[in-house]
């Protein structure tokens, strides 16, 4: 029978009053003994953290929904409304609901999410009526015995990373802390803490960047760490050493940078409950000061915990209205330590973000699979998210992506964030991807560069596709190859710089925008192809005239063909930019628009005097 203590084993140091109450079988006496001797004293929760009763709700979508788990969600929601640490009066009013729901477990044990809920109630609702508290302690201890003695049966199902952290890390730690009088409790808590520490090291780099494989369910993965840190602080325990605390703090900061102004995290599946309240609480328990940029950013978004409860725990119905360009980002910081951008080879992810302000411009790229994933937002409004698909054909034959991607260049400075990804399509063919996000000028540049070293290459076709979010409305310009996409109040202009501007002019490729994707296709008879796509979302340039064209690149008086170098010039209103990429190397400098350079790639702004001010320069 679940919840019985027939095989209970006590520590020699266990309080005799607690042991006698359990043996006597009187729940009221047991409840009084538990309140006095059987549970750790829990301190008052910080005002920066969400109510303790609501914290298990962060993980509800991590497990299969059942009538019992739905009832647990409702119960936790009601308890959370009673305060951060519900008092005796509030718990007396809710006691019947707790008892009624507890009766549903007389025949079978709870699943991990439900057990987490009951343990949370036991830890933070010690003011329950004595008889009910005793009954809850008895049942919860019975359910926890297999965890305490390490005899939990291995199930055939494969747990996701977030489920594994909760089941193998958080639950053993919580059980060990709450049932400290039982034999094996200390080892159990230590075992759980060890799992959590190892998972932090295994799934994050030394700077705290979580691995790209976690992004889809990142808040679900983070939640057990946050709750564990909160319980450890509330009970005066320490589950991390100094290095672990630093890593956890860094993880929280990196996760906050992945949060958009609409309250969702980049590349997530959207099913996570109240990620903003999770991240705010994470900042609190990780020790980020109130003046920290990440804390200020999250505070400016607004709370989602109340909305979570009102909507029955579904964050899909909690989405905020997009901010749009009406609310500008804060002035971009100049100090490197204040910039939220980061890149990690180990975690296979790059986070490009212009600042910590609400209404951020951001681009997150994950390169842990055969196709990189990309997530783009402008002024806090997400407009692209999903697989950044590519297709390359050499002499008409498809060359699939089969090798891993690596980040071969990363830079974050006062002008922009920049990343390069590279993969070998074959022994002779290389695909290079460039991403540049402007710090203050509100544009992003995406470039695919394909090169073949084979002299037999006579035809090269390449297509890249950028996945758009739901609700996109595309529109094609009447006379040029410019497209515009609109989502809410946000409008982006899309310029295929590698194609001729005028629609009536012949072009070796096409740009097509649908409700689902931006697809750029280009082709050449050479062995190298550069495919630049410039996306502008500046409100000031929304209706400005535009012109783009190729530029002449010379070396020692010789004009270079497209197989050796590619240069494009773009003008929008009074703003002009140059993009230059050298497909071949040379010990001599090359010249374009008066700029003499030895760099492989140059992205620069053309001033009113015709001078080139580099935004990004990349060595070969």
Identify the meaning behind each predicted range.
Residues 435, 518-523:
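Beta-strand-rich interaction surfaces with strong enrichment in secreted/lumenal proteins
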Residues 1-41, 231, 235-238, 251, ...:
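Terminal, non-catalytic domain-edge segments
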Residues 288-498, 527-529, 603-620:
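Catalytic and substrate-binding regions of extracellular carbohydrate-active enzymes
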Residues 524-537:
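Short Pro-Gly-centered flexible turn/kink motifs
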Residues 1-110, 364-366, 371-387, 400, ...:
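Ser/Thr/Asn(+Pro)-rich, low-complexity disordered segments
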Residues 489-519:
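Active-site/ligand-binding surface loops and adjacent short beta/alpha elements
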Residues 538-620:
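Non-catalytic terminal regions with compositionally biased, polar/charged low complexity
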Residues 38-252:
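Aromatic-lined, polymer-binding surfaces characteristic
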């Amino acid at each position: 029978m679940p919840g019985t203590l027939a095989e209970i084993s006590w520590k020699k140091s266990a309080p005799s009053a607690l042991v006698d109450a359990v043996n006597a079988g009187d729940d009221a006496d047991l409840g009084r003994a538990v309140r006095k001797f059987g549970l750790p004293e829990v301190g008052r929760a910080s005002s920066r953290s969400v109510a303790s009763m609501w914290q298990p709700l962060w993980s509800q979508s991590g497990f299969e929904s059942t009538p019992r788990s739905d009832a647990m969600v409702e119960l936790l929601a009601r308890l959370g409304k009673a305060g951060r640490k519900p008092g005796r009066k509030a718990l007396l009013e809710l006691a019947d609901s707790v008892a009624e729901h507890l009766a549903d477990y007389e025949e079978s044990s709870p699943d991990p999410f439900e057990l987490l809920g009951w343990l949370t109630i036991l830890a933070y609702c010690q003011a329950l009526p004595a008889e009910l508290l005793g009954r809850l302690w008895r049942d919860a201890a019975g359910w926890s015995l297999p965890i305490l003695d390490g005899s939990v049966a291995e199930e055939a199902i494969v747990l996701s990373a977030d489920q594994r952290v909760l089941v193998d890390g958080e639950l053993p730690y919580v059980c060990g802390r709450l049932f400290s009088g039982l034999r094996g409790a200390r080892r159990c808590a230590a075992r759980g803490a060890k799992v959590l520490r190892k998972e932090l090291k295994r799934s994050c780099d030394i700077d705290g960047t979580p691995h790209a494989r976690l992004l889809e369910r990142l808040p679900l993965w983070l939640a057990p760490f946050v709750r564990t840190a909160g319980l450890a602080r509330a009970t005066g325990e320490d589950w991390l050493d100094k290095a672990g605390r630093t890593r956890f703090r860094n993880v929280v900061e990196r996760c906050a940078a992945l949060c958009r102004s609409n309250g969702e995290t980049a590349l997530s599946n959207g099913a996570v409950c109240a990620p903003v309240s999770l991240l705010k609480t994470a900042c609190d328990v990780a020790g980020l000061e109130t003046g920290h940029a990440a804390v200020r950013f999250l505070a400016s978004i607004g709370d989602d915990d109340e909305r979570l409860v009102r909507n029955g725990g579904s964050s899909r119905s909690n989405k905020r209205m997009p901010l749009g360009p009406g609310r500008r980002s804060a002035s971009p910081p100049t100090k490197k330590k204040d910039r939220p951008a980061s890149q990690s080879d180990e975690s296979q992810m790059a986070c490009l973000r212009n600042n910590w302000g609400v209404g951020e411009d951001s681009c997150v790229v994950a390169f842990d699979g055969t196709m990189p994933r990309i997530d783009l937002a402008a002024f806090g409004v997400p407009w692209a998210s999903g697989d950044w698909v590519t297709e390359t054909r050499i002499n008409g034959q498809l060359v699939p992506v089969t090798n891993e991607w690596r980040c071969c260049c990363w830079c974050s400075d006062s002008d922009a964030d920049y990343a390069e990804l590279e993969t070998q399509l074959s022994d002779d063919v290389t695909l290079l991807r460039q991403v540049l996000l402007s710090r203050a000028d509100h544009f992003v540049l995406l470039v695919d560069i394909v090169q073949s070293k084979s002299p037999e290459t006579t035809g090269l076709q390449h297509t890249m596709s950028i996945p758009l979010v739901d609700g996109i409305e595309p529109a094609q310009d009447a006379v040029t190859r410019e497209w515009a996409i609109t989502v809410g109040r946000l409008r982006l202009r899309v310029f295929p710089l590698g194609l001729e501007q005028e629609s009536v002019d012949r072009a070796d490729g096409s740009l097509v925008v649908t409700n689902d994707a931006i697809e750029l296709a280009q082709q050449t008879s050479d062995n190298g192809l550069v495919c630049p796509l410039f996306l502008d979302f500046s409100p000031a340039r929304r209706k400005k005239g535009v012109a783009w064209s190729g530029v002449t690149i010379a070396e020692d008086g010789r004009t270079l063909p497209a197989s050796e170098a590619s240069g494009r010039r773009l003008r929008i209103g009074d703003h002009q930019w140059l993009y230059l990429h050298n497909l071949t190397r040379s010990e001599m400098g090359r010249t374009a628009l008066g700029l003499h350079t030895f760099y492989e790639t140059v992205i620069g702004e053309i001033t009113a005097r015709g001078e080139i001010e580099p935004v990004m320069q990349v060595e070969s």
